[in-house]
């Protein structure tokens, strides 16, 4: 019986055919000719339906549609070649390892290129593919060239014997699924096609440089003098010698901008005219040589000094046959005294996980978009990137080197989907990291402990190392992600150590770090971290390996909370060496959505389910510090503050400054007193040094003295503020000159004076109308009352939201027991008291509540007392406070408190105390609608009304929370365009609010930030001017 699945697609031992050995990547304009651009394209349901590429001619192919390379076929106009699929923890196909589905979309690409007789005579020709998803066959001029698997790894093919003078036809047959699909189950969209660059390489025939390995080692314990090792692989014998020239370094403060970075990556590299070291080796001598370098400047992420070099292959006539220009950084990575060290010093990761993503191009990310990402990271104090979960485009690593990042380079390997059936069947509930052991042990045999897949695992390990080995920014190799743990990982570790003993190896799936040099966790609680530290530290505080968090602070929607507590723990214990936030950006794909708010088409960002996938993982793909356009969210603003490399503490008439850099001093910074605008004289501080300076200032910022890298002079690195005392504005309560008109009617109570008219609905216990100077300040609009609900965040969904819904907190009702009105005393006009019980449907629990409105001529004091009674109470509440509907005369608001952005109890470190105006502040809108816009620690709030002055609000003795918005239906909205607008605004005035945490994938809200079930007593002054 013949099999309908081609053998290449179901044999994990066959990872390629005729692919050339992987070599270190370099780019040379003289060698590379881009084949990017329009290609002829046709999509077929299965390999069986696709044409025989050997018999395909250009006349037939050019009548097909065209597609741009690089791109994904699922992202073409009108989704005409199928739609994206999003999964995280599950496979989108039946598990039939190693077989892919028989119905397997197959894209056939074709184009031509021209070669003249000189090119045929002088050069060897290759085709290079930087990334094709999932696997492909290559044909040139009707002849089969080769085959390759490994979607995020490059491949080169020798096509010399297939090309001819004139027009040459290239055909690439791309298959959506194969046996390698099962080991490429990363948390992202399933997208297919030629999505990275395609190049025609022309290498000199008589001799060319095939590969280069450049390694640096310090030869003394003080890391002063170094040995530079250069190993050159030359193919061909028609050359005389090799020249190697090392040039004076460009120090780490070299100034770049986006255009200069892109220009260099396109081959337009400028060199120092001053040679540092020059060296030659004859053809018959070893092509591996070592050079002693006296006191080179070090490369670090904080000062990324690079030495450019030029490697020339010289012919017998003295001509240059080939020249390679690249750079080297002098740095040495070790595990010393249990810590990751670079150049002998411990480092701390302030990192992020970065996927390839573009909102319109998917993983076909233009280089300028990557540059934009990395510049943004530098602006936000990020010093490390984990390439999750596959190698990047090779040009990206030059950017890492130049800009200064610690990089974990990860193999293209994840098998998450093999765990999901067991997880669902057993409803596994266990504490991390025990879950890891249970899930991985049971499921490793499918792939990671399966000898049939060993070749594939090793191929991905070797490609990772051999292509990227020359980049100083890469200090750690990673064996993949969430792929259980088995014999194949052990083999990968052994191979990587053979290929490159100069770097460390990471793999989170290896709980006990048997095949890794570092312990690594994902989303642990603080208790688990501390337990692990104590279990791996002896009585003298020594340990063999550190712990990093390769994923933490899950940045899904409104969050992450408690980043400060993680960072404090990293600083406190040397055992921890920082971590990497999950993740850099949302993966939303731009599409047009029919809004449920107005029925019209609007731009939105798709997540799982928006393309009607049979299987998907929903909104879990929206979990970044940036939104889908890669613009900062409030979470990134918070992270910048928490990880700032200089700490500024202001208290008791002094300023204490601490340098938290790992290598550099504070000499590159200016410290400015924002109260006076003057510069503070701060001595040079080495890492971990502090100084305390007498000063009465309340606000200090640290900014760059000069342009450095991609950052401009004046760019803010860090800031500090004094803890300000509660500032209640001076307000004179007017004493009533004459008695107010009080009307205690059957349904309504009204109190009216010369400038104020207050009406309360006795039946509902809510303000019916509040007018000042005849203008409506607050009015009944579905009620103004004590409320507890807020729209859920993504981080509420796993537990808190379910609890709140279970206890019907969204269905709290106020049952009025009585309303009384009394004439005022001590200058007040009247006192209106509402006695009620606020409780949900179904449950016994509730609040015995007393609301007392003390009405003056120009203010209302609202005192609220709530006693929690009844059985079966919820553990906590989303919030507690009032909602007031603002009248049509509302204009804007200003506040004194934290700002200008949103803040929550566990996400507020980045928001500075100040006076802010809503006209100058734009509220952040999340790609996936949810609770947003809260302001904590507010001292007072002024709401301005046309023709009615302003309403000033403050709470005695402690700050409060507030939000002003015109949104509703946020709970039901699927995309930002679905959020409905009232056309008028409401004020949410809160006594307290629950934290946000990061429980979408991580720990719950910390105990101190939970709004626990309890009695509540609070009061607000509502003053009118």
Swiss-Prot record:
Gene3D superfamilies: 2.70.98.10, Galactose-binding domain-like, Glycosidases, Immunoglobulins. GO terms for biological process: lactose catabolic process. Keywords: Glycosidase, Hydrolase. It catalyses: Hydrolysis of terminal non-reducing beta-D-galactose residues in beta-D-galactosides. It comes from the Eukaryota. One of its GO terms (cellular component) is beta-galactosidase complex. The active site is at 482 (proton donor), 551 (nucleophile). The keyword Hydrolase applies. GO terms for molecular function: beta-galactosidase activity; carbohydrate binding. Its EC number is 3.2.1.23. Belongs to the glycosyl hydrolase 2 family. This is Beta-galactosidase. It comes from Kluyveromyces lactis (strain ATCC 8585 / CBS 2359 / DSM 70799 / NBRC 1267 / NRRL Y-1140 / WM37). The gene is LAC4.
